[in-house]
A protein has these predicted regions:
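Short loop/turn segments that connect beta-strands within beta-propeller blades
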Residues: 46-50, 85-89, 134-138, 175-179, ...
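Short, solvent-exposed loop/turn segments at conserved positions within beta-propeller repeat blades
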Residues: 75-76, 121-128, 165-169, 296-299
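Blade-level signature of beta-propeller repeat domains, shared across WD40, Kelch, NHL, RCC1
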Residues: 305, 320-382
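Repeated scaffold domains used in trafficking and secretory/extracellular systems
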Residues: 21-27, 59-68, 97-109, 145-157, ...
Length: 382
């Protein structure tokens, strides 16, 4: 892995703000940073760190999406879906569901798909789930199922795919026709879906290490991997060039779009257990494909910055936090991290790259000095 820089998260923070309770979700775009906590408080800052507004949604904020026109934030919190004015934080509408709201993705300009579920504490299992298509404050239609959907993949307006858990597993396809949701179940294999990527073509990770692909035409297929990985895929992320998967056995594997493994990293026991991945949006200042690996440790978490160079993956930086990282998001050269202790840390990519290079230069100078000293000692012994 080469020389790896280690820093406390406070040392690389461009900005630090805080919520009263544990952070449950973070959001960032080219103008604003938003954080939501487990008690429903949501605060919006400018990217310079000035507070713009705050509002209370009453329960754990689980997801934030910005409408395509940039006017409305679509949020889920507790048992509700909520519409919030992007400029001032005013609540415009809300819809209450029978169970907790788990997932949200937009459907065109003024609608969204919502996954909600009812959990039985005594049985320690999900009793029932619902997929709802909403139009602002109204439910257009609802589809009830026994399985818990673990991912939403909007295909076109009025049509989306959902990765299913047990008992049915596979991929559910819902299409709106004349105000009704038509359903089609695609049985891939009996391994439940655990996660899914967010950009088309979509990739779904299964508990047996297999990947399902939904291409740009809506075709569903098993991605033919050139190597089999029996470990569960706990997170998956993709961009235009590659797919990154995080396995339960602590391997991080990079695949090309044909399913061929290009390289891999292994998270060491001392680095904790990997929880999720995040590919850094857009081109970075060093011209490399950069990504974050978030792990949980005995005394907090690690935020690991890695990149791909010359067909190999390398860990460049380990950022230590004494609190668990709950969520991460990035946009336009800035990464935002939400911590269990309520802090929200913003990391500016250019500043971070500069510090890594300064450290590498310092290490190189130190290596030269050590070599020269050893040479002088050797000559003295001659």
């Amino acid at each position: 892995m080469g020389n790896t820089v280690e820093r406390p998260i406070e040392a690389v923070a461009w900005m630090e703000r805080s919520l009263e309770n544990s952070v449950s979700t973070v959001y960032i775009d080219d103008m604003k940073i938003i954080g939501g906590d487990w008690n429903g408080m949501m605060i919006c800052w400018s990217r310079e760190g000035d507070i713009l507004w705050e509002t209370n949604l009453g329960d754990r904020v689980a997801g934030i999406r910005l409408s395509t026109d940039g006017a409305m934030l679509w949020c889920i919190a507790g048992r509700e879906a909520i519409g919030i004015d992007y400029e001032n934080g005013t609540i415009k509408w809300n819809i209450e569901f029978d169970g907790s709201t788990d997932l949200i993705e937009l459907d065109g300009e003024n609608r969204a798909w919502i996954v909600s579920s009812v959990y039985d504490i005594e049985l320690n299992d999900f009793m029932e789930s619902a997929i709802s298509l909403i139009d602002s404050g109204d439910i257009v239609e609802k589809y009830i199922l026994d399985e818990r959907p673990w991912s939403i993949h909007p295909f076109e307006e009025g049509k989306a795919f959902f990765g299913l858990g047990r008992p049915k597993t596979g991929v559910l396809e819902l299409t709106e026709k004349k105000g009704k949701l038509m359903h089609k179940h695609n049985s891939i294999h009996d391994s439940p879906v655990l996660c899914g990527s967010h950009l088309p073509p979509f990739y779904l990770g299964h508990s047996n290490g297999m990947i399902t692909k939904i291409d740009e035409k809506g075709n569903i297929m098993n991605l033919e991997l050139n190597k089999k990985h029996g470990s569960a895929i706990i997170d998956i992320s993709s961009n235009n060039e590659q797919i990154l998967i995080c396995l339960e056995n602590k391997q991080i594997i990079c695949l090309n779009k044909d399913g061929e493994e290009e390289n891999s990293l292994e998270v060491l026991d001392s680095e904790g257990h990997p929880e999720f991945l995040d590919i850094i949006d857009g081109s970075t200042s060093d011209g490399l494909v950069n990504f974050w690996i978030v792990t949980s440790t005995n005394n907090g978490s690690l935020l690991i910055n890695a990149n791909r160079k010359n067909e190999s993956s390398n860990i460049k930086l380990k950022i230590k936090a004494n609190s668990r990282i709950r969520d991460i998001a990035n946009a336009k050269g800035m990464t935002v991290v939400g911590l269990d202790d309520g802090r929200i840390i913003a990391i500016e990519e250019k500043m971070l790259t500069r510090r890594i290079r300064e450290n590498e230069k310092s290490d190189e100078e130190g290596d030269v000095q050590r070599f020269e000293m050893l040479e002088r000692l050797r000559k003295l012994r001659e």
